[in-house]
């Protein structure tokens, strides 16, 4: 009966993977070209609806910032909505709003991006507005004085007054001892207090150049029409010299690091992070895709190992998770977190030991082919359905290009995941889950003596 069940499960997983992988074999038509001023343009056709997403990505984020000047990239993102030579503060957003467009922006360690989602026949408006602020952002001192207070309040609400965010910020600063990834994207409060509009203007002049940007357009468009519009609105913006930007590399084995934080939280928790490569820095892409699947083996839903073994089985933790970013500009972290089950009297030390047991199990015993196939099918299904969105497609393209990789990898990654074997899982676990790569944060409820 057990053999029959295993064969049935294997057949189900095979039938699930086949149509998903077939989608990877027939990607949407994608075109790329570069303007004379260095602006790279990537167009991906998706004609299912008369809608288009336009994203402009700049190769600058918090990992580019130096001590004492943290938060500049995020602050500049805010100020990009505060007026250009043609338009006053907020006027571009008003125009887009009246056209029924969605717009926003985001900043990370590695990039800053601005996007609009709108009807295909309004694409010219979005590109004209985006080119205008690239060419002639004004950065008025009075607008900066108001906006920096908004940013400081954002930091208070999202980080300083939010224990989980504050804990991760401190943990990240310890886990990345050698690279700019230890810098919080929003910046340290001391640097926000001292930031000047002159610093922001210098940051804009240094990094906001067409030859440091990638325009991604996905939707009901063709390459020729986008090229005409890109030339019209961006073609006359001159290229500029951009500062050199080195890849953020970490120490391979910086040594075990530990911090204990006392915060205004009701329950204790812990984080464990291992210094590992990303796709841009790995010796082999197979290592990276193995780490992605390990994260899913541990925390890929109800039947994953952490909830099955530690949460419901041993009742050791109330919750546990695993997370890995495969696509930074430099090195990455593989992060585990857990909250011990205080109702059964479990401690942080016991929860940490339980997480270690799961990693050691992967080091000593490769997963079965059936378990790996099930997890891989979940990961592939998630990627396929996520890419059904034109916004997700554009974001994947922009992220890859901006961290120094090729957009073509998004059309190859399903096959790369399919190639990972149980032995690859075991090898990655053995190579990367070592104590000299480890950072640990224990978060405890604030004690009265520490107030």
Language model: regions and residue ranges:
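Bacterial N-terminal signal peptides
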Residues: 9-20
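Boundary at the C-terminal end of the N-terminal hydrophobic targeting segment
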Residues: 22-27
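M16 family metallopeptidases and their MPP-like homologs
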Residues: 44, 49-75, 89-133, 164-190, ...
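Active-site His/Glu-centered metal-binding helix of metallohydrolases
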Residues: 72-80, 294
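Short, polar/flexible loop-turn hinges at active-site or ligand-entry regions and domain interfaces
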Residues: 82-86, 134-142, 364-367
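An aromatic/glycine/proline-enriched structural segment found at the starts
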Residues: 177, 185, 214-280, 444-451
């Amino acid at each position: 009966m057990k053999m029959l069940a295993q064969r049935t499960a294997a057949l189900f997983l095979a039938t699930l993977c086949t149509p998903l992988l077939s989608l990877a074999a027939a990607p949407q038509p994608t075109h790329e070209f570069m303007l004379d001023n260095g602006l790279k343009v990537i167009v991906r056709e998706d004609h299912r609806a008369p809608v288009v997403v336009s994203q402009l990505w700049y190769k600058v984020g918090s990992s580019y910032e130096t001590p004492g000047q943290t938060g500049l990239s995020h602050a500049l993102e805010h100020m990009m909505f505060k007026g250009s030579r043609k338009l006053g503060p907020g006027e571009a957003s008003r125009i887009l709003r009246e056209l029924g467009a969605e717009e926003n922006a985001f900043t990370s360690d590695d990039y800053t991006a601005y996007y609009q989602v709108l009807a295909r026949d309004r694409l010219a408006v979005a590109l004209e507005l985006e080119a205008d602020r690239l060419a002639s952002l004004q950065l008025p001192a009075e607008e900066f004085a108001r906006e920096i207070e908004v940013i400081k309040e954002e930091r208070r609400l999202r980080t300083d007054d939010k224990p989980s965010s504050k804990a991760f910020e401190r943990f990240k600063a310890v886990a990345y001892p050698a690279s700019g990834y230890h810098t919080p994207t929003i910046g340290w409060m001391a640097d926000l207090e001292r930031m000047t509009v002159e610093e922001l203007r210098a940051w804009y002049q240094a990094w906001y150049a067409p030859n440091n940007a990638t325009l991604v357009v996905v939707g009901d468009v063709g390459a020729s029409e986008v090229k005409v519009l890109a030339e019209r609105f961006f073609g006359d913006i001159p290229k500029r010299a951009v500062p050199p930007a080195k890849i953020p590399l970490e120490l391979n084995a910086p040594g075990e690091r530990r911090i204990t934080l006392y915060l205004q939280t009701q329950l204790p928790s812990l984080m464990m992070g291992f210094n590992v490569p990303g796709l841009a820095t790995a010796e082999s892409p197979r290592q990276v895709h193995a780490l992605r699947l390990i994260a899913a083996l541990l925390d890929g839903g109800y039947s994953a190992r952490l909830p099955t073994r530690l949460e419901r089985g041993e009742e050791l933790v109330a919750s546990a998770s695993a997370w890995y970013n495969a696509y930074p500009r430099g090195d990455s972290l593989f992060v585990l977190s857990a909250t011990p089950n205080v109702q059964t009297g479990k401690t942080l030390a016991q929860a940490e030991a339980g997480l270690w047991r799961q990693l050691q199990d992967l080091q000593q015993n490769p997963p079965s082919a059936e378990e790996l196939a099930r997890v891989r099918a979940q990961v592939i299904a998630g990627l396929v359905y996520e890419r059904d969105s034109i916004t997700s497609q554009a974001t994947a393209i922009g992220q890859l290009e901006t961290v120094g990789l090729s957009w073509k990898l998004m059309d190859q990654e399903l096959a790369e995941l399919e190639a990972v074997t149980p032995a690859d899982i075991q090898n990655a676990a053995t190579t990367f889950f070592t104590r000299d790569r480890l950072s640990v944060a224990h978060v405890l409820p604030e004690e009265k003596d520490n107030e």
